[in-house]
Amino acid sequence: METAKDGEQSPSEASPSAQAGPENIPEPMSREEESQPLYHEETIDLGGDEFASEENEPTSEGSHNFGDKLNEHMMESVLISDSPNNSEGDVGDLGCLQDVGEPPRGATDHRLPSSTDKEVVDTLSNGSETDGDDTPRDISDMTPDSRASLKEDSTQEDVTSMPALENAATEEVGPKDSLAPREEQTSEVSSNQSSSKDEPLPVCTIFSQATATPSQPHLFLQDGFESQMVKSPSFSSTSETSAKTPPPMVQPSPSLSTFFGDTMSSNSLASDFFDSFTTSTFISVSNPNAGSPVPEKLSSLTAPVGEKSPDSTSPSYSTRMDRSESGVSRAPLDVPESPKPFSQIQAVFAGSDDPFATALSMSEMDRRNDAWLPSQATREVLMSVATQQYGTVFIDKENLTMPGLKFDNIQGDAVKDLMLRFLGEKAAAKRQVLNASSVEQSFVGLKQLISCRNWRAAVDLCGRLLTAHGQGYGKNGLPTSHTTDSLQLWFVRLALLVKLGLFQNAEMEFEPFGNLDQPDLYYEYYPHVYPGRRGSMVPFSMRILHAELQQYLGNPQESLDRLHRVKTVCSKILANLEQGLAEDGGLSSVTQESRQASVQLWRSRLGRVLYSMANCLLLMKDYVLAVDAYLTVIKYYPEQEPQLLSGIGRILLQIGDIKTAEKYFQDVEKVTQKLDGLQGKIMVLMNRAFLYLGQNNFAEAHKFFTEILRMDPTNAVANNNAAVCLLYLGKLKDSLRQLEAMVQQDPRHYLHESVLFNLTTMYELESSRSMQKKQSLLEAVASKEGDSFNTQCLKLA
């Protein structure tokens, strides 16, 4: 006979999603290409709006000298990009805002054609347009002859871009140094004046970033490994854009126990868990289309055909990729007043609500949640990656994380299988549940499956999404790149497997992650994808799950060892914070409010580790150490003191220590006297009922359970235990009526596995012809429950 107890949910955190993006690095042109227009290079103009006008609109003759303005504007672009900071990081930050400022006064506010706008926004949204190690490209000055020619003729002309400078420090080119190229350019510009007026002007700048389109694939450096196409599970290829899109926000996810608990609250939806990485426009390595703003829309699993997968990267850390060629961005010629460098920066931030404060808030939240202390070997690898300039850091394949699905079979539906066996095909056809193919192939569908308790279908969908990330079946042991997106998917899949009791499958798929300390599981390993971000990409709850899994496989000592390692790191981080340092022990300049938030977070995480250790000790039947561990947890969760003391008392009841259990129950009454509310009174009455159960006084226990039901008629624990008391009092019929009435009253809430197990046991005690009643329960389960229901409680097999 199974007696339901109060379930306690344990807190856990999930790491956020983050930004990533591929990068293309420009290459210097040869001498022969200097005087030819780059028709096959796509270029981006930092100030595209100042040079844009309606198509085929001629330039007015009263405008300023075009050559001077173009030259001055391009030189300012070089000055901006050649700042001491990494240009790649700067461009990534500006691109995330995706705001285009108003042109200076006196300039015509014309926009580029829609296709050009999309290409510019997509490319600026890419987090790594250029590499700080590469030499910036410059535009040579034009001769006075060519300026005169441009001033006389007001039609649109082709302007050729000059080769990149060999020295990055050289920002200005003197007239003597570029005399020969200018003469060649002058003759060519003069000859081009007789061309058609409809020829567009390719706008030149220092960046050469190709837009990922189906007809323009990226060319990656050949690394000897199979490249996989990655389609983002979080964003669609919708081409619509908006004028403004809020900056991407990274928010921590709530506890999985909220959604995987035995009793699900109506206001605890699975959508809450995934909001942190489905409602923000994050930029991912496997998601180069994230830059295209898709406001208030969640995407399907689609991506341009020409995209390359992060799986094509080699096991060694490499930053070089070949530059792809594409069509030149075309826009009509306009000659506004040339803006100053600071005007350009202000134009980018125009219309945003304090973007610097937003970025600071995001970084503080990331720092708190992502902080972790790597091992010495991992720290050395990350330092070599951070300090490398022009070389490549090579890492052994054994030190990388290369996961893949170990099984790809469909999980199926055990409830429907039982219906086919006992009720026939006609009855089984009436069962309609969601599966992995009937929902959107994205996080939206994953949330829907979890909220409907179709966890087996959710496992299948996680496998499909991981396959889209290049980590599917058969990919185990192959090089891959990780994102917070993919690691969240792994965590959800593994948590679902553990919840379904598929411990062996979870262990096999956890194996490639090792001890979760490989260097490619840290943000520092991807400086061009996550510029400036530090910490671990692994969710903290995934570390807890990794440690707890072994106790379900019969290795509780291994679980304790892993939990002790996690506890050591949490204690060290908490000690650093309490000493006024950063999480990693370095100097910190955060505000007092932010420091208090970090201390609170890591105290909560340390308490969560101790809670898992206490559960493991309880499983090992080391009750003395388990009680001590639970008492220690109270220091970190003082608001849960009544629940923890009640749990300790019930543990003592199970081992027969009635007096000590009564002492702890009295302590609960003292604590709850300070609290007002119904829950405190119910907790005290429940403890008294269990105390009488431990003394085999079922009549008194039934009285207290009945009193609880008068105060809270929906209390399933009290209802189930009251029926059990009636059974032990010899009142089988009354016990059956109470359980049946409870199930019929609210099937969705009371079709609990423990309740149904007790009910089927009573059916067997009542009559040898209990199969028909069990089949009736199966029909009720089929109409309400998802595919995660444990059919063993029905005792039909």
Swiss-Prot record:
Per-repeat ranges for TPR: 607-640, 642-675, 682-715, 716-749
Gene3D superfamilies in alphabetical order: Tetratricopeptide repeat domain (1.25.40.10)
Any Pfam family the entry gives: TPR_19
Compositional bias ranges of the Low complexity kind: 9-23, 232-244
Chief location of this protein within or outside the cell: endoplasmic reticulum
PTM field: Phosphorylated as the cells enter mitosis but is dephosphorylated at or before the onset of anaphase. The phosphorylated form recruits CENPE to kinetochores more efficiently than the non-phosphorylated form.
Residue ranges, compositional bias (Basic and acidic residues): 29-43, 66-75, 107-121, 173-185
Phosphoserine modified-residue sites: S125, S128, S234, S309, S314
Bias (Acidic residues): 47-58
InterPro entries found in the cross-reference section: TPR-like_helical_dom_sf, TPR_rpt
Modified-residue entries (Phosphothreonine), positions: T130
Listed Polar residues bias regions: 206-216
Family annotation (SMART domains): TPR
PANTHER family documented for this protein: D-ALANYL-D-ALANINE CARBOXYPEPTIDASE, TRAFFICKING PROTEIN PARTICLE COMPLEX SUBUNIT 12
Subunit annotation: Component of the multisubunit TRAPP (transport protein particle) complex, which includes at least TRAPPC2, TRAPPC2L, TRAPPC3, TRAPPC3L, TRAPPC4, TRAPPC5, TRAPPC8, TRAPPC9, TRAPPC10, TRAPPC11 and TRAPPC12. Interacts with CENPE.
Function, in words: Component of the TRAPP complex, which is involved in endoplasmic reticulum to Golgi apparatus trafficking at a very early stage. Also plays a role in chromosome congression, kinetochore assembly and stability and controls the recruitment of CENPE to the kinetochores.
Name of the protein in question: Trafficking protein particle complex subunit 12
Organism: Mus musculus (Mouse)
